Amino acid sequence: EAPANAVTMDDPTAQALKYHPSAADSDRVAAARPGLPPEEQHCANCNFMQADVGEGDYKGCQLFPGKLINVNGWCASWTLKAG
């Protein structure tokens, strides 16, 4: 069950960034970013995810202030987490 402040696919920012809460169902292969093979790209290993915000499968993201993203999701701004 997604929290009330989870990013939805009809969110304008989500649409602009091609965000999908399920990376497997996203455009990550066609719009793959450098750093990892497309099938390994998801929010949990993205530099923008805020691991200390939210809980469970829903965490904060610098690109969606005040909202939570699914750690299994993907968007076109995916950037490999440093370290």
Curated annotation (Swiss-Prot):
PROSITE patterns: HIPIP. GO terms for molecular function: 4 iron, 4 sulfur cluster binding; electron transfer activity; metal ion binding. Gene3D superfamilies: High potential iron-sulphur protein. This is High-potential iron-sulfur protein. Homodimer. Belongs to the high-potential iron-sulfur protein (HiPIP) family. InterPro entries: High_potential_FeS_prot (IPR000170), HIPIP_sf (IPR036369). Specific class of high-redox-potential 4Fe-4S ferredoxins. Functions in anaerobic electron transport in most purple and in some other photosynthetic bacteria and in at least one genus (Paracoccus) of halophilic, denitrifying bacteria. It is found in: Periplasm. The keyword Iron-sulfur applies. Coiled coil: none annotated. [4Fe-4S] cluster binds at C43, C46, C61, C75. The lineage of its organism: Bacteria, Pseudomonadati, Pseudomonadota, Gammaproteobacteria, Chromatiales. GO terms for cellular component: periplasmic space. It comes from Thiocystis violacea. It holds the Pfam family HIPIP. Its main location: periplasm. Keywords: 4Fe-4S, Electron transport, Iron, Iron-sulfur, Metal-binding, Periplasm, Transport. GO terms for biological process: aerobic electron transport chain.
